[in-house]
Amino acid sequence: KSGKNYMMMGTSVYTYQCLYVKSLIDQGKLGKIQYLRGTHFQDMEGWPDYWKGLPPLHYATHAISPLLFLSGQRASRVHCFGSGTMREELVRNYGNPYPVETAVFRLEDGRTSADVTRSLFETAHEYVEGFSVFGDKMSFEWNFENDAPYVYTFEEGMTETNIGNRGRVISRQEVHCPNREEILPEAIRKYTTEFAILDPDNPDMYMKQGGGHHGSHPHLVNEFVSSIIEEREPMIDVYTAADWTAAGICGHESAMKNGEEVVIPEFR
């Protein structure tokens, strides 16, 4: 109760992709959300020592936050399993034996579930930060960092079926998510995409700016500064930040208990 504003700089809920899906949900195009899935694969070899052997779900907000943000819920319970083995040097730091963890979360409505898979070490995969949201009218799937996402839509009418009358016809469409610069002050709109700043004294030298984490940075800055000016809580306030972080912490606790259910604390 300091009277100050605190905001978690959660890049994953302000990416092109997440803002696009939020728009689909707000327009009712996805319909009823049935299931959500998040992934984050990243090899952390060579990073500072405090990363070595970190439990995967202790740094899982990139995979968890879009799911909770888009569902408008917090996670209430979790079952999680760890997978694989790591060299002893990595296990020693945190007592964590797992390079990969997969969690299934029950959301607070008691009906919706979400799963998250996170890896940090000794797993041969390119960098991936992606999520999927499955609705009863339309679904969105983004599986690979630099690939375009897709939407899947039921054709109109419950009687539209595939050959043999089994299963409804579903269309698949590649989507290109807009950067939503129009909702930002004009002065910072350019930072949603990458551009080069040239050094006039060294024409061959330049520095890349903007576009980080799929255009999220200016949206985060705008939300935080606006919350101060407007004297309100920011979108990712302390309680939301705690919800997103605790989900991963409790997920790892479940993994260390061989998948036992762990109840996630409520902080409000």
Question: Across the structure, where does each feature detected by a protein language model lie?
Answer:
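C-terminal capping/lid region of NAD(P)-dependent oxidoreductase domains
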Residues: 4, 31, 253-268
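Contiguous beta-strand/loop segments that form the cofactor/metal-binding neighborhood of enzyme cores
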Residues: 58-179, 208-210, 217-234, 249-252, ...
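Alpha-helix-centered segments that form part of catalytic cores
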Residues: 186-220
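Conserved alpha/beta-hydrolase "acid-adjacent" motif
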Residues: 236-238
